[in-house]
């Protein structure tokens, strides 16, 4: 046996083309990598001081691609141990100390020479908004404590501030659209282009104490107090945004409990949103301390109530509806609930934070229709507590609340914001967009550091990731073509 001389030559050619093609590919990769990874990476840190906890986000980008051409990525997301800073009313200093652990974790990832050049921000949201209403001197003490700790850490600390609900909504919207590349995009032809406005997505955020809805409506925004304007990459955007204080998940759960206690005061509270067979003791005092609760505990009640789950989704939905004032919108056009103006919904929406966490647990993040979502949550609410508890042994402190928060989200989106069976498919439940966690923090940092310029960049023609990918793809195609041609030739001869 043996190959003919012709076949040997062809095999040799084939091998050679394969090897040289591969070499070219490797060279291209090495060259491109050295272009894409210059030594100077910049960093930025944002603390998201929410009502239930604080998170640290570390972002990084290339120093030579500032002013809009850079792509910011997330290098670290760290959950601060302990509760939100607004809980440290009796020991403000500890609120500052609690941030140390995550900060140290972030500093490990940043070269020491750059520590002092790393812009660091702390933004507080609805938890502190509520506290400063209730007792502004306590809120001031807490801000002073976190400012002191971050001010003496080896970073470039820009300050701690209370974010208004509108800013929280707007920055969440910027984060989503920046992550998705719907504000500006690098095209295959090597130009920066502006995607059509229909590509912009709305943002639905739900924290512990407040919830935000932000989108670009199709028509004018009639209530100017709900309008936020900004200029990004040379385009003007007018978004509708509203933040509902006391409609975050945790405050909603407290208000729900109080509503049930008030409507039927008794030492044994039967809770329709807790699964049947669930039982616990509830201390009444702390429940009524929330600034979102405007009632006093019935005098006839003991300090501690026994709470029993009944797993009744119908009764649960009725109790949840009591948290909304739908009648205040009756007869008014473009009104959501509690008398709040809302223009007609438009386009795609990303629902994140507690929207995502709740629906992720319930396996409802894969674009199920509204009827399936409803049926799934109702089915979950009717499961016996014993079975559910056994499936998730001690791993989830929110386990008893998923029925309530699932039905709450459904009520808010469907009856509150007005998503119907037809518009429900425009909702995506997501945690991330373009590799970054969705929240207000990235949009906030981009804005404060001026990394999204108001004007369109003049010369945006640097090597981009998209072009690099295209090059690789074309090289691979070329390689495949060469090999294919050689193979055809080879088999053709053997015929
Ligand atoms: C970005 O813009 C600022 C001022 O707008 C300028 O000082 C800086 O040099 C610019 N950076 C780059 C890399 O072009
Ligand atoms: C606010 O808190 C401080 C200290 O905890 C307390 O002395 C003060 O009475 C509180 N003020 C109000 C209005 O509750
Ligand atoms: C209420 O419950 C707490 C523990 O949850 C307990 O420390 C307290 O003594 C109880 N109070 C009364 C009046 O039973
Ligand atoms: C609902 O809003 C209307 C109009 O703002 C008000 O008159 C009514 O008292 C509210 N209902 C409740 C239950 O708060
Ligand atoms: C979600 O799906 C997983 C895997 O299919 C399953 O184990 C889990 O029980 C489901 N969760 C709920 C709440 O039904
Ligand atoms: C959810 O399902 C229940 C029971 O099947 C039904 O009564 C209710 O109207 C449904 N809700 C929605 C929003 O479809
Ligand atoms: C971004 O920051 C500038 C000041 O640097 C401010 O005027 C502007 O309103 C901010 N944008 C948004 C959306 O808040």
Swiss-Prot record:
The keyword Nucleus does not apply. The chain crosses the membrane at residues 9-29, 472-492. It is a multi-pass membrane protein. InterPro entries: GDA1_CD39_NTPase. Residues 1-8, 493-495 are cytoplasmic. Its EC number is 3.6.1.5. Its main location: membrane. GO terms for cellular component: plasma membrane. One of its GO terms (molecular function) is apyrase activity. It catalyses: a ribonucleoside 5'-triphosphate + 2 H2O = a ribonucleoside 5'-phosphate + 2 phosphate + 2 H(+). The active site is at 168 (proton acceptor). Residues 30-471 are extracellular. Ca(2+) or Mg(2+). Has lower efficiency with Mg(2+). N-glycosylated. Signal peptide: none annotated. Not inhibited by ARL 67156. Keywords: ATP-binding, Calcium, Cell membrane, Disulfide bond, Glycoprotein, Hydrolase, Magnesium, Membrane, Metal-binding, Nucleotide-binding, Transmembrane, Transmembrane helix. Glycans are attached at residues 67, 304, 363. PANTHER family: ADENOSINE/GUANOSINE DIPHOSPHATASE, ECTONUCLEOSIDE TRIPHOSPHATE DIPHOSPHOHYDROLASE 8. The transmembranous domains are involved in regulation of enzyme activity. Canalicular ectonucleoside NTPDase responsible for the main hepatic NTPDase activity. Ectonucleoside NTPDases catalyze the hydrolysis of gamma- and beta-phosphate residues of nucleotides, playing a central role in concentration of extracellular nucleotides. Has activity toward ATP, ADP, UTP and UDP, but not toward AMP. This is Ectonucleoside triphosphate diphosphohydrolase 8.
